[in-house]
């Protein structure tokens, strides 16, 4: 057997293994009152809502992957934000990954999105609604220059600034992750109204979408919130540190073994996955 065939078989075996992630075997939300459990990168959800696929204000991408589940607060946030955007005539909001029916760990692509409180939203607002084919295979619009130091001026639109600001001003939002170059542009454009910038955090990648995270719902007693972002607009030395070259001898951290699940999430898996 030649090397190409061996590599292909290994890839297929790897894909099959990834597809067998226990959380992906739960195909419907777990009945019960809505409860986000654990942390954003190690948790689950009971009583998730399904984001309605049909809406005049937003469109859901990659519906074949069935990642449009979340806490009712997340569904209401998406509906609230997209309605604001529509009322301002800014375009259609494009919704990416939320979470799986019971939350939990993905087979790749996300470390978080596990408690039904995270959503990815494309940083483009089409004036014409996308076709079904476009939604199934969406084309991301990379807003960041090749060197990663600034946004591409021709692609940066006032509507995108407004979209991020509207999301950050929402009472339920605790963090929004964007590329450092996008955060930098927001800092430049913000003027004197800057309180909302505290919630916008620079992070790796995130060149074409923002990752919005909500605070733990008050009645989700097993939900673990993150500490609040540091005071201030986050436009100073911390942001600039993202553009500095890595220090000599810096190596990528080793991949950590996932921590044990919260007991309630483990019990959920034990009950619902054969």
Curated annotation (Swiss-Prot):
One of its GO terms (molecular function) is serine-type endopeptidase activity. Zn(2+) 1 binds at residues 110, 113, 120, 211. Residues 227-274 are annotated as: Disordered. Binds 2 Zn(2+) ions per subunit. Zn(2+) ion 1 is bound in the active site. Zn(2+) ion 2 is bound at the dimer interface by residues from both subunits. Gene3D superfamilies: 3.30.1380.10. InterPro entries: Hedgehog_sig/DD-Pept_Zn-bd_sf, Peptidase_M74. One of its GO terms (biological process) is peptidoglycan metabolic process. One of its GO terms (cellular component) is outer membrane-bounded periplasmic space. Residues 1-19 form the signal peptide. It comes from the Bacteria. Murein endopeptidase that cleaves the D-alanyl-meso-2,6-diamino-pimelyl amide bond that connects peptidoglycan strands. Likely plays a role in the removal of murein from the sacculus. Dimer. This is Penicillin-insensitive murein endopeptidase. It comes from Escherichia coli O1:K1 / APEC.
């Amino acid at each position: 057997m030649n090397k190409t065939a061996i590599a292909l078989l290994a890839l297929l075996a790897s894909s099959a293994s990834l597809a067998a992630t226990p959380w992906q075997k739960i195909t419907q939300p777990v009945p019960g009152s809505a409860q986000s459990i654990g942390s954003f990168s190690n948790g689950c959800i009971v009583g998730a809502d399904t984001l309605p696929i049909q809406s005049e204000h937003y469109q859901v991408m990659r519906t074949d992957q069935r990642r449009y589940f979340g806490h009712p607060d997340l569904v209401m946030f998406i509906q609230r934000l997209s309605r604001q955007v529509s009322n301002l005539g800014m375009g259609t909001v494009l919704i990416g990954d939320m979470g799986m029916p019971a939350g939990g760990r993905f087979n790749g692509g996300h470390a978080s999105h596990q408690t039904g409180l995270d959503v990815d939203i494309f940083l483009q607002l089409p004036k014409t609604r996308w076709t079904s084919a476009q939604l199934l295979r969406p084309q991301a619009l990379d807003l960041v220059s090749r060197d990663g130091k600034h946004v591409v001026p021709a692609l940066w639109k006032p509507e995108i600034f407004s979209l991020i600001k509207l999301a950050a001003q929402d009472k339920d939002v605790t963090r929004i992750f964007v590329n450092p170059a996008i955060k930098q542009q927001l800092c430049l454009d913000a003027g004197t109204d800057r309180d909302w910038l505290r919630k916008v955090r620079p992070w790796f990648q995130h060149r074409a979408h923002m990752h919005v995270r909500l605070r733990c719902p008050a009645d989700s007693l097993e939900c673990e919130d993150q500490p609040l972002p540091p005071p201030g607009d986050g436009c100073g030395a911390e942001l600039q540190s993202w553009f500095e070259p890595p220090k000599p001898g810096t190596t990528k951290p080793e991949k950590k073994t996932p921590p044990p699940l919260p007991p309630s999430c483990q019990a959920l898996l034990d009950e619902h996955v054969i």
